[in-house]
Amino acid sequence: MSARVDIPADTSAAAKGTAPLIAASTHVKGGYKKGLAIFDLVLRLGAVVTALAAAATMGTTDQTLPFFTQFFQFQASYDDLPTFQFFVIAMAIVSGYLVLSLPFSIVAIIRPHATGPRLLLIILDTVALTLNTAAAAAAVAIVDLAQNGNSSANWLGICQQFGDFCQKASGAVVASFIAAGVLLFLIVISALALRKR
Amino acid sequence: MSARVDIPADTSAAAKGTAPLIAASTHVKGGYKKGLAIFDLVLRLGAVVTALAAAATMGTTDQTLPFFTQFFQFQASYDDLPTFQFFVIAMAIVSGYLVLSLPFSIVAIIRPHATGPRLLLIILDTVALTLNTAAAAAAVAIVDLAQNGNSSANWLGICQQFGDFCQKASGAVVASFIAAGVLLFLIVISALALRKR
């Protein structure tokens, strides 16, 4: 008799156990996608600030040396180097895109299971990442050259003379690399959110 | 009586119509994902060849000028410029990754609805794209400098002397940009394949 009582008790417990578990797991899935979407929005705001800071820092990089000859004053500005000009333009485009992408990120929070905004975000984020990385890598190549020069090509470093210029440019490059890292993370989040399960 | 006959005939036709339509659409969906996966594999093979060509071209870029002084022979090699060294290493890593990713692409063809390999591919492809773009952009900044020099920083172009060197390096950069474009396309394909529908 104890066995008879036991077996129904067990199966009913199992049945009771599974039903709430499934409900809980679907609830958790929705919450998980929503959590990813909120995380996406927060990271995106951070990326906007970082990309804007990179563009603004590089865009205001110039230095005039305090001494001058009769005919010439020594001055270095970001637009002396085409790579730094490209950097400013590219980072400005990335910042603009990130601001415009905020509404889509909010839509993804409201409707965590909609794939349309996610798909749009992942594709455009990848393009923005490419642009951002190109700007950062090209600028770092030039900053390294300005810092160390290259003896083989007979290019001398200019950071001995224009120290502040180089420091500001380096800061902008670091900011753009951080923005690229955040964008890479955003793409991973979008890919996880696009998954079927 | 004609009305009685018409109505059942219509509904049965509708019922007959819907059932095969649903079956056909699920079949088309599977085929669409399989088609994307096959396209992915073909593009990936193309990217392997392009990335390898970029690495090999840059890695064999050197030029010795046919004249020399008593003490010095003029020579330019890719490893005189750290950016070009980085380019060779980065493109070799990208090629290696692309070769290793081929089995996952084949798994995605065999099981078009599995999200695991797709998710892995999209994340690692994004990392590879970042590396590839960084190498290409940094190299293009240096190639531009070698071609045109920069009067503000007093860096003179070296392509007047080392013409073949510059041409080979430019070719490698072009190949790496093509590889980056293919990788971008692969990510879009993976994102489309990851969609729920």
UniProtKB/Swiss-Prot annotation, chains A, B:
InterPro entries: CASP/CASPL, CASP_dom, CASPL. Glycans are attached at N150. One of its GO terms (biological process) is cell wall modification. Residues 57-85, 141-171 are extracellular. It comes from the Eukaryota. Pfam families: CASP_dom. Keywords: Cell membrane, Cell wall biogenesis/degradation, Glycoprotein, Membrane, Transmembrane, Transmembrane helix. GO terms for cellular component: Casparian strip; plasma membrane. Residues 1-35, 107-119, 193-197 are cytoplasmic. The chain crosses the membrane at residues 36-56, 86-106, 120-140, 172-192. It is found in: Cell membrane. It is a multi-pass membrane protein. Belongs to the Casparian strip membrane proteins (CASP) family. Regulates membrane-cell wall junctions and localized cell wall deposition. Required for establishment of the Casparian strip membrane domain (CSD) and the subsequent formation of Casparian strips, a cell wall modification of the root endodermis that determines an apoplastic barrier between the intraorganismal apoplasm and the extraorganismal apoplasm and prevents lateral diffusion. Homodimer and heterodimers. This is Casparian strip membrane protein 3.
